[in-house]
């Protein structure tokens, strides 16, 4: 066997070993909080400069929480619809941005407990 074949075989074995050693959750979809923090919080998070939160605060005038994470009336189907189709000035998000699995996790995270 040549030196080149030995190196190629060793590299293949190393790749298999690394794949087998990957954490169990490595291929699992993100949890809903992680998805929210990445895609939603820039507009719908707490604090100044959050246009989504400001718009909901103006709309609800205290009748409902402006912070999505504090709402108790967001069924998963509604969250999924808003994310995929957008609403008012909120853009829609493609499956290449938020996968179906991530959207499921997000909708579950924001759903009434």
Predicted features along the sequence, with ranges:
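Bacterial N-terminal signal peptides
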Residues: 10-19
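Hydrophobic transmembrane alpha-helix bundles
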Residues: 13, 24, 54-55, 85-93
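Electrostatic cytochrome c docking/interface patches
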Residues: 19-35, 50
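Axial heme c-ligation environment in periplasmic c-type cytochrome domains
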Residues: 60-72, 78-113
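N-terminal secretory signal peptides that target proteins for export/translocation
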Residues: 1-6
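Periplasmic/extracellular electron-transfer cofactor-ligation site
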Residues: 33-64, 81, 89, 112-113
């Amino acid at each position: 066997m040549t030196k080149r074949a030995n190196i190629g075989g060793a590299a293949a074995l190393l790749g298999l070993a690394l794949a087998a050693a990957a954490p169990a959750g490595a291929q699992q979809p993100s949890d809903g909080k992680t998805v929210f923090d990445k895609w939603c919080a820039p507009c719908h998070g707490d604090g100044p400069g959050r246009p989504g939160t400001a718009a909901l605060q103006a709309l609800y005038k205290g009748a409902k929480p402006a912070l999505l994470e504090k709402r108790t009336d967001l069924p998963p189907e509604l969250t999924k619809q808003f994310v995929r189709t957008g609403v008012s000035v909120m853009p829609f998000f493609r499956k290449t941005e938020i996968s179906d699995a991530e959207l499921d996790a997000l909708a579950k995270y924001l759903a009434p407990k």
